Amino acid sequence: MPKEKYDPPDPRRLYTIMSAEEVASGKKSHWTELEISGRVRSLSSSLWTLTHLTALHINNNNLSRIPPEIAKLPHLVYLNLSSNKLRSLPAELGNMVTLRELLLNNNCLRVLPYELGRLFQLQTLGLKGNPLSQDILNLYQEPDGTRKLLNYMLDNLAVHPEQLPQRPWITLRERDQMMPTAVFTVMCYNVLCDKYATRQLYGYCPSWALNWEYRKKGIMEEITNCDADIISLQEVETEQYYTFFLETLKDRGYDGFFCPKSRAKLVSEQERKHVDGCGVFFKTEKFALVQKHTVEFNQVAMANSEGSEVMLNRVMTKDNIGVAVLLEVKKDLFATGLKPPPEKQLLLVANAHMHWDPEYSDVKLIQTMMFLSELKSIAERASGSINSSSPTSETSSIPIVLCADLNSLPDSGVVEYLSNGGVAENHKDFKELRYSDCLTNFSCNGKNGKPDGSITHSFQLKSAYEGNLMPYTNYTYDFKGVIDYIFFSKTHMSVLGVLGPLETQWLKDNNITGCPHPHIPSDHFSLLAQLEYHPPLPPLNGLHLPVHSTACESKMLTE
């Protein structure tokens, strides 16, 4: 059902005629409704150029057909075709998904195109006075008959095309042949939890294609086709993690770690099975698990509220979580050439799903700050205790890969914070709420802060998908944009290539107004990046070289 309130056109259709003075002064006319009457038999093709129309009244005429070009009026919410001589309707009528009211009363219609089922925002469908089949009329005359009839037609509409085109692989740079680097792939994918996949949210998708038993096959096919070395998933239902994802991926050589959202602690055992969370999987032939961690944002918020009411009332009430696994990179993953350093090569892989509501940009930003603050503590402890031979126990000594559904656009404070290493404490995304007293708890500068009043983190991160490589990661009728990300430590890693987007024109040509779709099992597209890890170089004459060495340094080390 549509989310916005619909007000039908005023039947009186009041209008005002501009005076000669108004015309002379250059005043522009504005009209969005059109009525055509007079027992008209055919329609002029110039009608389809009036793309600004929101209401079209062509009832009480002698029209026997409606041309498919009517779908060129993309803003129509009201269409009255009643009391004509229509015997059929064009299938293209189903592309007019903005329609809220479609009146077809008193015509000669015996059948309806199943494409009408795609009109998921339609509230009123007038069919009285047509010689339709009894099955259609019976369904239409039931309580909430319009909705039931549209659902029936959508569920029985033939699906085209039969398969998706391949997404392109975008090569960004070549592997460093001079150094013993490790190359691996990382996937980030929000799989759309079953309980969120409702017809209320995704009315444009057939009910059978929203069903989890159908969608999970497409989701696993997407995962296995990508064959990533590290997989980060969001919106994984607890029961499905253990009975489906872990079970299936273990057979393919993965191990995994999962944690549900914090509300799992507060519900019954039966309800707990359906709480979603975040999971990380990794190929055991390439990585070994060292540590695993869960970060509950509401608990971190409570511990750092500093008496802040907005922290308690806005941040602590959200049950989002993040997970992290500390992995050892196995030596076989490194290319031949220089031997990798004898010390353990560690990698911190983090995965999170931030709060969804656009009105809570402050919460998303603080959740991100809390997550990086906790990751900093994890990295510092790991660097000091496990890799004590490292020249430093600083956070930056352990590289990080951060995958997340941030529910934030590229121009948001969240992405600015991650990409630039900090954000101003008076950033607009804080909504002028009083967080300043507790924000410094999450800054790498601690209570001292920075002179410019910014909140910083100590990870030097870069997005694998920079620029416009991916125009959208979330693709629904109401929203199309980038909210999913893969970040990595740019001091230790570089990105060699990424999986590109599904062609926008293909989606338009096939009238895919949003996902999920019978061929696209989630409302998100997966991200896949190939990363190259440059381990620290062994000391040269007692000096520790930078991670990214020059070719000259490489030559010196091989001699």
UniProtKB/Swiss-Prot annotation:
List, from the UniProt record, the residues annotated as the active site of this protein.
Answer: D405
SMART domains given for it?
A: LRR_TYP
Q: What is its EC number?
A: 3.1.13.4
Q: Which reaction does it catalyse?
A: Exonucleolytic cleavage of poly(A) to 5'-AMP
Q: In terms of domain of life, where is this protein from?
A: Eukaryota
Q: Which SUPFAM superfamilies match?
A: DNase I-like, L domain-like
Q: Return the cofactor note field.
A: Binds 2 magnesium ions, but the ions interact each with only 1 or 2 residues.
Compartment list: Cytoplasm; Nucleus
Kindly list the positions annotated as binding substrate: E235, E271, H353, P358, N407, N474, F479
Renumbered to this chain, region (Required for interaction with cnot1, cnot3 and cnot7) spans 1-148
Which residues are involved in binding Mg(2+) 1? Answer: E235
Biological role stated in the UniProt entry: Poly(A) nuclease with 3'-5' RNase activity. Catalytic component of the CCR4-NOT complex which is one of the major cellular mRNA deadenylases and is linked to various cellular processes including bulk mRNA degradation, miRNA-mediated repression, translational repression during translational initiation and general transcription regulation. Additional complex functions may be a consequence of its influence on mRNA expression.
Query: What is the protein name for this chain?
Result: CCR4-NOT transcription complex subunit 6-like
